[in-house]
Each structure stands twice: as structure tokens, then as C-alpha cells.
């Protein structure tokens, strides 16, 4: 897509934002992430120091620039890459006008997931997946809180609200508004503040206090400033600043509080929430893992949407891939990333310290390519981000087990959730070092439990009782302040084969 940019004291990124076009800017626009690239079609933009960090000389000569650093002194036409977003996926026929529905919503830091669910059967009828437009203000919640405090709060609230509203409109196409009985929302605590149009300043500084984050029912028009639906909205309860209602909903869906055995739950989103325990007691924490395991912040990364590479393996000396819904590859999601890095480590393409082996050309591991197409790769910066994310999660798991006074062998089941894709291989998890081998072999992938739990929270009669029980019996702690976390984090940066 080509865009005409006028001469201005403002950056290309700023001008695009003012038109409602939200390029990813994981760093918030300070030139340190390299995600807001554009290509000059006509005109001139000077090369900046930040451009030289992220682009080769050939790319610079081809006109690639970082939009956040490009200040146009004359008119220029730039090409921006269209962000891949899944539309509506039909699971079942919506049926007759007699059917009643609930809309389940999972507001993630990186992705938005919504489902139209048959209220009687609990079966999803339609699913909508979107990128969270707030990605333009940073990849993680801390960066976004900072941007909100610097004056961007109103626009950050508005673009989130409008993206959700547009997705809801698509979901209910062809369905009478009286058939929609309610909207049930699960999200992390920061997204809850943004949705309710509350400044999240207290979430970004010690002691990270929260207010009024219990279960709440609100009119649709109050939240979305639009009355095309007249049903209530149910906001599910958050535990604290770091354990949101997405985790609470996920545990509800898994019937976590009915488990006799010690179970470890990992929601592998940008915030990396972890819970261990059983029906009698639970301990929870979160780790700032970043969006890499959701495909965010990677050169060819994306969520688990149709066309995303979700599995990678070696067969007869050649890389093989599958994609979500068997569509032509357009990027790579979390499960594909885990497979690719684990395979690269096993084959010696990726060294223990995370560097690409010298025999890998182009400073990138090519996952897939086609004649005349853009190859899908993991470059050195991608691998570093994956390295940091896996180390944060691995160290957090070990701290959590210590806090709960448990050994790995005492945990009988490990449940992984989040926007990985369609599956995860235990062998890849162990090779990557994301989990100890003892836990990796006990793991299973449960998909988007927050989204499924949001529907359960509306449909199940015992939902509120179960969620309140979890809030009462759960203790939390700060992983970053836990003794030994930094040492564990440094130790697990290495891709040590287990």
C-alpha cells in the first residue's frame, strides 16, 4: 500500500497514525525495535543512525527506512506493509432466529480474539481474530502505560474500543440483536483499565495497586459508546496488576480448582502468567516474556491465524512446514517458532549462546520460500528475542515451584495456553529449554483457554463461585523480586540441549 507523506516536523509514523494507520512499533516509536519499516517509492528520506542498525546497505539503497525516525523535508511516497489479520472463521451454521448467543472476548496485549457462542450448547459458531491496534504504542503493557501517561491515553482507548466494536459487528452479521444475550470479556489488567477508560498509571509503578477489578456488569453502550447491541457486558475479575481475568477465565475453563493433583498452568502471552497448585491452594506469578511466543516483534512473526506456519520439521534433508488451516504461508506463529528454533539448535544451525552458525548465510534461518515470493525467516534479532522470552519463562517456572515448595517431579500435569498456534511439541519445548525435560514430557497445549473461559463465565451457573474461590485461595509474588531470579534468567539464556 502506497501512502503520500507531506513535508513536516513530524515523523512518517506520526503522520500515518494521525490517519488511523497503526504500524507496529514495539518500542513505542523510539527507533529501537525496527518494526515500523517503510520503503520509499518516490522522493527522499535521509538515512538515520537507527536505519543503519536495522538495514543492510542494499536495503538502505532500496529505500527502506524506519517510519518513527523518518522526518520528511519534502513530499515522499512510501510503501507500507499491510498487516495480516484473520477475518471471520465459521465453525458452525449460526442457525435460526431462535438461537441465543453470547460473545466471548479475549483482549490480549498482542491479539484480540472473539467468538460467537451458542448459549445453550457452548459451541462456538464464529471466531474473529484481530491484532491489538495498541501495538503501535509498544509491544508490552509497561511501554503502553508510559505512552498513556505521556498523553496518548485517549487515542489508545479509542482505537482499542473501535477495533473490538468492528470485530463484534462482523461476528453478528446476519443475526438479530435480540439473539445476543451478552458479551463476556477476559483480559489482562492493563487492558481492562483501557477498556473502561481508566488511566492505568497505578499499574506502572510500585506498589502496582489496582482498584475495582472484580466482576462487573455494564451496559453495552457504556463501554463501546454505541448502542447497536442492547445486551449487558460482563467484565471478568482480575486478581492483581499482573494476573488478569484472562488467567481466571482460563482456569475456570480447565476446571483447575477441581484438580486433586499438582498442576502447572502457563499462559504464554506477552505477560507470561503462571499458576501452580490444585483445588486446595494456588500460587501465581507473571513474567515479562514479551510477545515473541505469540509471533509479535519478529521479522516474519504473527499470531496463530490462517496461513501462519505452525509446525516445522526436517524430512530427507529439507525443511517441511504446515500452516494454520493449510493456507499458503504468510508468516510464522509461536508453535512454528518453537519448532524452528529447537530444530535449528538440534542441527547446529543455532549455537548454544544463540548465535547463528557461520555456515548460515544471510544472517537468518530461512524457514520457507517460494519462487518470486518473500522468504519467511528467523533472523539473529528474532532469535535473541526468543532467547530472552524463553529464559524469562523458564526462570519464572523455577521460582514459582520454589515459592510453592514443589519439585518438578511432584507436578503431575503441565497445561500450556495462549496464542501459540494449533499445537506444541513437548520435544521442542525441552530442546528450546522453555521447560525442564521432566515438565516438558508432562505438557499439553490447551489453546486459547481465556477465550473459552470467557464463554464459560457467562454460560456456567457455577462460574462466579469458581472464580471467586480462585481469587480467595491464590497467593501471588513478584518474579522479578524473587531471590535468585536474575541468576536463573542469566543461566537459562543459553540454548542448552537437555
Q: What residues fall within each predicted segment?
A:
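Immediate flanking context of iron-sulfur cluster ligation sites
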Residues: 6-34, 41, 45-67
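Fe-S ferredoxin-like electron-transfer domains
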Residues: 46-107, 112
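Acidic, glycine/GT-rich loop-and beta-edge segments that sit at the periphery of enzyme/chaperone cores
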Residues: 64, 234-247, 456-498
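Conserved phosphate-binding catalytic cores of ATP/NTP-utilizing and phosphoryl-transfer enzymes
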Residues: 85-100, 230-263
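Glycine-rich phosphate-binding loop of actin/hexokinase-like ATP-binding domains
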Residues: 114, 122-135, 139-140, 201-217, ...
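N-terminal phosphate-binding loop and adjacent alpha-helix
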Residues: 133-174, 297, 308-311, 385-388, ...
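Phosphate/ATP-binding catalytic cores across multiple sugar-kinase/actin-like superfamilies
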Residues: 162-171, 247-250, 254, 387-409
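Catalytic phosphate/nucleotide-handling subdomain of diverse soluble enzymes
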Residues: 278-280, 298, 406-471
